[in-house]
A protein has these predicted regions:
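Charge-rich (acidic/polar
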Residues: 18-215
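Bacterial N-terminal signal peptides
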Residues: 2-13
Length: 215
Protein backbone atom coordinates (compact mmCIF):
# COMPACT_ATOMS: atom_id res chain seq x y z
CA UNK A 1 0.00 0.00 0.00
CA UNK A 2 2.79 2.36 0.92
CA UNK A 3 4.54 1.67 -2.37
CA UNK A 4 1.34 2.44 -4.29
CA UNK A 5 0.93 5.71 -2.41
CA UNK A 6 4.54 6.62 -3.12
CA UNK A 7 4.13 5.79 -6.80
CA UNK A 8 1.00 7.94 -7.03
CA UNK A 9 2.80 10.81 -5.33
CA UNK A 10 5.69 10.54 -7.77
CA UNK A 11 3.32 10.45 -10.74
CA UNK A 12 1.45 13.46 -9.41
CA UNK A 13 4.70 15.39 -8.98
CA UNK A 14 5.82 14.47 -12.49
CA UNK A 15 2.47 15.54 -13.91
CA UNK A 16 2.69 18.92 -12.17
CA UNK A 17 6.27 19.38 -13.36
CA UNK A 18 5.33 18.54 -16.94
CA UNK A 19 2.35 20.89 -16.79
CA UNK A 20 4.51 23.71 -15.46
CA UNK A 21 7.14 23.09 -18.14
CA UNK A 22 4.46 23.06 -20.83
CA UNK A 23 2.96 26.32 -19.57
CA UNK A 24 6.41 27.90 -19.46
CA UNK A 25 7.12 26.76 -23.02
CA UNK A 26 3.77 28.15 -24.20
CA UNK A 27 4.48 31.48 -22.51
CA UNK A 28 7.92 31.68 -24.09
CA UNK A 29 6.53 30.85 -27.53
CA UNK A 30 3.91 33.57 -27.16
CA UNK A 31 6.55 36.09 -26.09
CA UNK A 32 8.74 35.11 -29.04
CA UNK A 33 5.83 35.79 -31.40
CA UNK A 34 5.20 39.19 -29.82
CA UNK A 35 8.78 40.44 -30.03
CA UNK A 36 9.27 39.00 -33.52
CA UNK A 37 6.15 40.75 -34.79
CA UNK A 38 7.23 43.97 -33.07
CA UNK A 39 10.66 43.75 -34.68
CA UNK A 40 9.09 42.94 -38.05
CA UNK A 41 7.02 46.14 -37.90
CA UNK A 42 10.14 48.19 -37.24
CA UNK A 43 12.12 46.53 -40.02
CA UNK A 44 9.20 47.01 -42.39
CA UNK A 45 9.74 50.78 -42.17
CA UNK A 46 13.42 50.62 -43.15
CA UNK A 47 13.09 49.89 -46.86
CA UNK A 48 15.56 47.00 -46.82
CA UNK A 49 15.47 45.16 -50.15
CA UNK A 50 17.80 42.35 -49.08
CA UNK A 51 15.63 39.69 -47.43
CA UNK A 52 18.51 38.08 -45.57
CA UNK A 53 19.62 41.43 -44.16
CA UNK A 54 16.05 42.24 -43.12
CA UNK A 55 15.90 38.94 -41.24
CA UNK A 56 19.23 39.59 -39.53
CA UNK A 57 18.09 43.03 -38.40
CA UNK A 58 14.75 41.67 -37.22
CA UNK A 59 16.52 38.99 -35.20
CA UNK A 60 18.88 41.57 -33.68
CA UNK A 61 15.94 43.69 -32.53
CA UNK A 62 13.94 40.73 -31.21
CA UNK A 63 17.05 39.43 -29.45
CA UNK A 64 17.56 42.81 -27.82
CA UNK A 65 14.01 42.79 -26.46
CA UNK A 66 14.57 39.32 -25.02
CA UNK A 67 17.95 40.16 -23.49
CA UNK A 68 16.55 43.32 -21.90
CA UNK A 69 13.64 41.37 -20.41
CA UNK A 70 16.07 38.90 -18.84
CA UNK A 71 17.99 41.77 -17.23
CA UNK A 72 14.79 43.43 -16.01
CA UNK A 73 13.33 40.18 -14.68
CA UNK A 74 16.55 39.41 -12.82
CA UNK A 75 16.64 42.90 -11.34
CA UNK A 76 12.99 42.81 -10.30
CA UNK A 77 13.36 39.35 -8.74
CA UNK A 78 16.23 40.59 -6.58
CA UNK A 79 14.34 43.72 -5.59
CA UNK A 80 11.11 41.85 -4.89
CA UNK A 81 12.36 38.78 -3.06
CA UNK A 82 15.76 39.52 -1.60
CA UNK A 83 15.42 42.84 0.18
CA UNK A 84 17.33 42.74 3.45
CA UNK A 85 15.18 43.37 6.53
CA UNK A 86 15.88 45.98 9.16
CA UNK A 87 17.67 49.27 8.59
CA UNK A 88 15.99 51.28 5.77
CA UNK A 89 19.39 52.70 4.85
CA UNK A 90 20.67 49.18 4.21
CA UNK A 91 17.58 48.43 2.12
CA UNK A 92 18.15 51.57 0.05
CA UNK A 93 21.79 50.68 -0.44
CA UNK A 94 20.81 47.18 -1.54
CA UNK A 95 18.28 48.60 -4.01
CA UNK A 96 20.92 50.93 -5.44
CA UNK A 97 23.39 48.07 -5.84
CA UNK A 98 20.84 45.92 -7.68
CA UNK A 99 19.81 48.76 -9.98
CA UNK A 100 23.42 49.72 -10.67
CA UNK A 101 24.25 46.14 -11.62
CA UNK A 102 21.30 46.02 -14.02
CA UNK A 103 22.20 49.41 -15.49
CA UNK A 104 25.76 48.26 -16.17
CA UNK A 105 24.43 45.17 -17.92
CA UNK A 106 22.07 47.31 -19.98
CA UNK A 107 24.83 49.72 -20.93
CA UNK A 108 27.02 46.95 -22.30
CA UNK A 109 24.10 45.35 -24.08
CA UNK A 110 23.04 48.70 -25.56
CA UNK A 111 26.49 49.44 -26.98
CA UNK A 112 26.76 45.97 -28.48
CA UNK A 113 23.28 46.21 -30.01
CA UNK A 114 23.91 49.61 -31.61
CA UNK A 115 27.28 48.45 -32.95
CA UNK A 116 25.71 45.38 -34.56
CA UNK A 117 22.90 47.42 -36.08
CA UNK A 118 25.41 49.96 -37.39
CA UNK A 119 27.14 47.18 -39.29
CA UNK A 120 23.88 46.40 -41.09
CA UNK A 121 22.16 49.78 -41.47
CA UNK A 122 22.72 53.34 -42.60
CA UNK A 123 22.70 56.06 -39.89
CA UNK A 124 19.21 57.08 -41.03
CA UNK A 125 17.93 53.51 -40.73
CA UNK A 126 19.53 53.16 -37.31
CA UNK A 127 17.63 56.26 -36.19
CA UNK A 128 14.43 54.69 -37.50
CA UNK A 129 15.05 51.57 -35.42
CA UNK A 130 15.64 53.67 -32.32
CA UNK A 131 12.46 55.63 -32.98
CA UNK A 132 10.58 52.38 -33.60
CA UNK A 133 11.67 51.06 -30.21
CA UNK A 134 10.53 54.29 -28.49
CA UNK A 135 7.17 54.98 -30.18
CA UNK A 136 8.52 57.78 -32.38
CA UNK A 137 8.60 60.21 -29.45
CA UNK A 138 11.70 62.11 -30.64
CA UNK A 139 10.40 63.39 -34.00
CA UNK A 140 6.91 64.01 -32.61
CA UNK A 141 8.18 65.98 -29.62
CA UNK A 142 10.79 67.90 -31.59
CA UNK A 143 8.17 69.02 -34.12
CA UNK A 144 5.98 70.12 -31.24
CA UNK A 145 8.70 72.33 -29.80
CA UNK A 146 9.27 73.91 -33.22
CA UNK A 147 5.53 74.57 -33.55
CA UNK A 148 5.30 76.12 -30.10
CA UNK A 149 8.48 78.16 -30.41
CA UNK A 150 8.99 79.17 -34.06
CA UNK A 151 11.66 81.71 -33.07
CA UNK A 152 14.12 79.20 -31.60
CA UNK A 153 17.69 79.83 -32.69
CA UNK A 154 19.71 77.10 -34.37
CA UNK A 155 21.67 76.60 -31.14
CA UNK A 156 18.46 76.25 -29.12
CA UNK A 157 17.01 73.79 -31.63
CA UNK A 158 20.20 71.75 -31.41
CA UNK A 159 20.00 71.71 -27.60
CA UNK A 160 16.37 70.56 -27.65
CA UNK A 161 17.13 67.78 -30.13
CA UNK A 162 20.28 66.67 -28.27
CA UNK A 163 18.28 66.21 -25.06
CA UNK A 164 15.57 64.24 -26.85
CA UNK A 165 18.15 61.99 -28.51
CA UNK A 166 19.82 61.32 -25.16
CA UNK A 167 16.46 60.44 -23.64
CA UNK A 168 15.86 58.04 -26.51
CA UNK A 169 19.04 56.09 -25.77
CA UNK A 170 17.83 55.43 -22.22
CA UNK A 171 14.23 54.80 -23.29
CA UNK A 172 15.36 52.09 -25.71
CA UNK A 173 16.47 50.00 -22.74
CA UNK A 174 13.37 50.56 -20.60
CA UNK A 175 11.07 47.62 -20.10
CA UNK A 176 7.59 49.12 -20.29
CA UNK A 177 5.81 51.91 -22.12
CA UNK A 178 5.54 53.91 -18.89
CA UNK A 179 9.26 53.54 -18.21
CA UNK A 180 10.09 54.66 -21.74
CA UNK A 181 7.85 57.71 -21.48
CA UNK A 182 9.26 58.54 -18.05
CA UNK A 183 12.67 59.02 -19.63
CA UNK A 184 11.23 61.48 -22.11
CA UNK A 185 9.29 63.30 -19.38
CA UNK A 186 12.51 63.67 -17.41
CA UNK A 187 14.36 65.15 -20.36
CA UNK A 188 11.44 67.36 -21.40
CA UNK A 189 11.68 68.85 -17.93
CA UNK A 190 15.33 69.62 -18.59
CA UNK A 191 14.47 71.11 -21.96
CA UNK A 192 11.76 73.31 -20.50
CA UNK A 193 14.11 74.52 -17.77
CA UNK A 194 16.73 75.33 -20.42
CA UNK A 195 14.20 77.23 -22.52
CA UNK A 196 12.85 79.09 -19.50
CA UNK A 197 16.36 80.20 -18.61
CA UNK A 198 16.69 81.46 -22.20
CA UNK A 199 13.62 83.64 -21.69
CA UNK A 200 10.86 81.49 -23.18
CA UNK A 201 7.48 81.23 -21.44
CA UNK A 202 6.17 77.76 -22.26
CA UNK A 203 2.66 78.44 -20.96
CA UNK A 204 2.41 81.55 -23.10
CA UNK A 205 3.83 79.62 -26.04
CA UNK A 206 1.00 77.09 -25.69
CA UNK A 207 -1.57 79.89 -25.66
CA UNK A 208 0.00 81.59 -28.67
CA UNK A 209 0.01 78.31 -30.59
CA UNK A 210 -3.68 77.72 -29.79
CA UNK A 211 -4.49 81.23 -30.99
CA UNK A 212 -2.67 80.59 -34.26
CA UNK A 213 -4.86 77.53 -34.89
CA UNK A 214 -8.10 79.53 -34.72
CA UNK A 215 -9.49 80.66 -38.10
Amino acid sequence: MASVTLALAILSTLARTEAASSAEADEDAAYTRVITERADRIVGQLGIDDGEKATRVRDLIAGQYRALREIHDGRDAKLGHAKPPGDPAVARAWTNVVRDQANRQQFGLHRQFVARLSAELTPEQLDQVKDGMTYGVVPITYRRYLELLPDLTDAEKAAVLANLLEAREYAMDAGSSDEKHNWFRKYKGRINNYLSSAGYDMKQAEQNWAARQRP
